[in-house]
Amino acid sequence: MSEFLNENPDILEENQLPTRKEDSTKDLLLGGFSNEATLERRSLLLKIDHSLKSQVLQDIEVLDKLLSIRIPPELTSDEDSLPAESEDESVAGGGKEEEEPDLIDAQEIYDLIAHISDPEHPLSLGQLSVVNLEDIDVHDSGNQNEMAEVVIKITPTITHCSLATLIGLGIRVRLERSLPPRFRITILLKKGTHDSENQVNKQLNDKERVAAACENEQLLGVVSKMLVTCK
C-alpha cells in the first residue's frame, strides 16, 4: 500500500488561498454605491473595457453621483402637524429594532488559521493545504447565550508527520485567543492521513493535556513563532 501524501501537494501562493472574492469584487464595482443598477452597468462596461480608469466608466461615476443627490425635504416648524407618539408606543417601538446575529462562518475560521506558519517549512498551513476551507464546519446560531462549535480536520503532509500535534496545538491556541468563549473547538486529523490518528486526536482535544502543553514555555515559544504570520 502506497504511503499517503497530502491530497493537494501543490504549494499555493498567498493570493490563491480562498477568500470572499465575490463580496470584494462587488464592492470594487460599486465603488461606495449601494445601487444594484450601478453594479450592473459597471459590470457590462468592464466586459468591454477592463480598465477601471476608462473615460466611459468615469463618466458613469459622475452620473451616479449626480443621481445620488436628493433634494432635501421642505423644513417646517409646525410641530403640531406631527402625530404625538404615546408612551406605550415608544416602549413598544423600542423592542422592534433587534441586532442581527453576528454569525461566524467557515471562511472566517479559515482566515484565522490559514496564515499560521508551518513549524518545519517556511510556508503557511494554507499554502501547504494542511488546512482547507472545505474541512471546516461551524455550528453557530449567532445567539451569544448559546454554545457554538467549530470542527477542523487537518491534513498532515505525510502519514508519519511528527509535528501534527504541534500544528494542531497552534491552531487551537489561535482560535481560543480569537473566538468568544462560547465556542467549543474540536481539531481532528483527517481520516487516513496519519499513522497515529487516534492518539493525536485524543491529545489535541484533551483539555488537561492542552493546558499542560501551554504551560511549557519552550513549546509555547514555538507556537508563538508560528502565529507571528497570522493576519
Curated annotation (Swiss-Prot):
List the protein's name. MIP18 family protein YHR122W
Disulphide linkage map: none
The protein's job, in short, is: May play a role in chromosome segregation through establishment of sister chromatid cohesion.
Q: Which Gene3D superfamilies match?
A: 6.10.250.1280, Fe-S cluster assembly (FSCA) (3.30.300.130)
Q: What is the lineage of its organism?
A: Eukaryota, Fungi, Dikarya, Ascomycota, Saccharomycotina
> Where in the sequence is N-acetylserine found?
2
The membrane spanning regions, by residue number, are none
Q: Which GO terms describe its cellular component?
A: cytoplasm; cytosol; cytosolic [4Fe-4S] assembly targeting complex; nucleus
Per the record, which residues fall in region Disordered? 1-26, 75-100
InterPro entries hit by this protein = FSCA_dom_sf (IPR034904), MIP18 (IPR039796), MIP18-like (IPR002744)
User: Which PANTHER family does this one have?
Assistant: CYTOSOLIC IRON-SULFUR ASSEMBLY COMPONENT 2B (PTHR12377:SF0), CYTOSOLIC IRON-SULFUR ASSEMBLY COMPONENT 2B-RELATED (PTHR12377)
What more the UniProt record tells us is: Present with 1800 molecules/cell in log phase SD medium.
Q: Signal sequence: where?
A: none
Q: What segments bear the compositional bias annotation Acidic residues?
A: 76-90
Which Pfam families does the UniProt entry name for this protein? FeS_assembly_P
UniProt record similarity statement: Belongs to the MIP18 family.
Q: Which GO terms describe its biological process?
A: chromosome segregation; iron-sulfur cluster assembly; protein maturation
Q: State the source organism's domain of life.
A: Eukaryota
UniProt entry keywords in alphabetical sequence: Acetylation, Chromosome partition
